[in-house]
């Protein structure tokens, strides 16, 4: 049953991103070359950073539209988005391409290894992009990650439309550096992604304030949100610098990012938005599955550490 989510603001958010099917195998150890290994368990989840962030945004109270592509095997992903209140009218269904998917092995130590297949996520066309942006205006926001193709063209169309652009550069690779990063309004990233954008070698100790400061120097007009794992997160926006600790548990970037964006656009201060995001993340890590674990706004508001 589709849940009604109360909306607090009038602008729309376009999440143009990935839609995946995650096949998660529980194994005693990672399969080796030439080995046939029986899995102890198989779970199938909805996945993709794009899908997860769309759900987080919608559950945080934003009017959220997801654009992307799936194959005929991924129709159930639309049900998951709709149930969370996300508009799926801009998702293209392709008959000759399979939905993007991930084959994930989880071993007894809690580690994993992943094989990704881009599928329909890598079949975005310029024509589809043009059609999508006909539905948005200069008060709206675009959120992108790095799991679909045509990102440079998507950024170009967003700028022509006058939209603000939010970038979560994950997974990080050279495609991100090919984007006009000086046109990004919000960076949501972890310390490793930040160092790669800055062409830094990984230091022995991570200094979040130093790294976020370097990013701010490089992109002075942008708001920088840097997640630091167990150390929490930091944000620089203009002359404002804010640190946020975590609520006892490891941060979930997709959930935290969605709630931070929603908080800022709903008129919260940076400190308030970061605190809300940290609470949402703490709730999410206590549950199974990426998308199902994302809390609704009322749960976050009632959360006590």
What residue ranges belong to the model's regions?
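Hydrophobic pocket-lining residues within nucleotide cofactor-binding pockets
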Residues: 19, 70-72, 249
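Substrate-binding N-lobe of the ribokinase-like
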Residues: 4, 13, 33-101, 303-304
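Short, conserved phosphate/pyrophosphate- and ester-handling motifs at nucleotide-, phospho-/glycolipid
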Residues: 57, 190, 258
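Short glycine/proline- and charge-enriched loop/turn segments
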Residues: 31-39, 190, 242-245
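Positively charged, low-complexity intrinsically disordered leader regions
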Residues: 6-32
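Hydrophobic residues within alpha-helices
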Residues: 53, 77, 154, 260-261
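Conserved phosphate-binding/catalytic region of the ribokinase-like
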Residues: 3-7, 174, 205-305
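Ribokinase/PfkB-type carbohydrate-kinase core domain
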Residues: 7-16, 79-93, 106-242
């Amino acid at each position: 049953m589709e849940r009604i989510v109360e909306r607090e603001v009038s602008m729309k958010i376009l999440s143009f991103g990935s839609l995946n099917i995650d096949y998660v195998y529980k194994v005693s150890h990672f399969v080796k070359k030439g080995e046939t290994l029986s899995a102890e368990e198989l779970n199938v989840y909805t996945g993709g950073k794009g899908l997860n962030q769309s759900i987080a945004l919608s559950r945080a109270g934003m009017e959220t539209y997801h654009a992307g592509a799936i194959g005929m095997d991924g129709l159930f992903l639309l049900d998951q988005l709709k149930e969370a209140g996300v508009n799926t009218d801009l998702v293209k269904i392709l008959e000759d391409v399979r939905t993007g998917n991930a084959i994930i092995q989880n071993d007894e130590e809690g580690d994993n290894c992943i094989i990704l297949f881009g599928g329909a996520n890598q079949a975005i066309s310029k024509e589809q992009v043009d059609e999508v942006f006909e539905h948005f205006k200069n008060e709206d926001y675009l959120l992108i990650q790095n799991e679909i193709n045509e990102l440079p063209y998507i950024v170009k169309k967003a700028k022509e439309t006058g939209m603000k652009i939010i970038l979560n550069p994950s997974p990080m690779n050279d495609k991100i550096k090919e984007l006009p990063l000086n046109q990004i309004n919000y960076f949501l990233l972890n310390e490793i992604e930040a160092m790669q954008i800055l062409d830094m070698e990984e230091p022995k100790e991570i200094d979040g304030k130093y790294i976020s400061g370097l990013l701010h120097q490089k992109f002075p007009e942008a708001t920088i949100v840097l997640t630091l794992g167990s150390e929490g997160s930091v944000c620089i926006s203009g002359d404002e610098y804010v640190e946020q600790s975590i609520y006892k548990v490891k941060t979930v970037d997709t959930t935290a990012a969605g709630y931070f964006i929603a908080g800022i656009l709903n008129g919260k201060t940076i400190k308030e938005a970061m605190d809300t995001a940290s609470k949402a993340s703490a709730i999410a890590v206590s549950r199974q599955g990426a998308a199902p674990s994302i809390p609704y706004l009322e749960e976050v508001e009632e959360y006590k550490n």
